[in-house]
Amino acid sequence: NVYQYRKMLQCAMPNGGPFECCQTHDNCYGEAEKLKACTSTHSSPYFK
């Protein structure tokens, strides 16, 4: 649930929040997409 997710984020990132976590995650995928070895049939880690 959302409460447990928030507690997990507080444990891993005590001074951060869900928006910072999601931004870091998205930036990581953005950089990985630039690597030839990391390309796939999907242009995004999120299925549309």
Swiss-Prot record:
Top-level taxon in the UniProt lineage: Eukaryota
Function field: Phospholipase A2 with weak enzymatic activity, which partially inhibits thrombin enzymatic activity (Ki=73 nM), completely inhibits thrombin-induced platelet aggregation and retards fibrin clot formation (IC(50)=0.2 nM). May exert this anticoagulant effect through a non-enzymatic mechanism.
Catalytic residues of the enzyme: H25
Record's protein name: Phospholipase A2 TI-Nh
Sections of the chain in a coiled coil: none
SUPFAM superfamilies, per the entry: Phospholipase A2, PLA2
Cofactors (names): Ca(2+)
Keyword Cell inner membrane part of the UniProt annotation: no
Family to which the UniProt record says this protein belongs: Belongs to the phospholipase A2 family. Group I subfamily. D49 sub-subfamily.
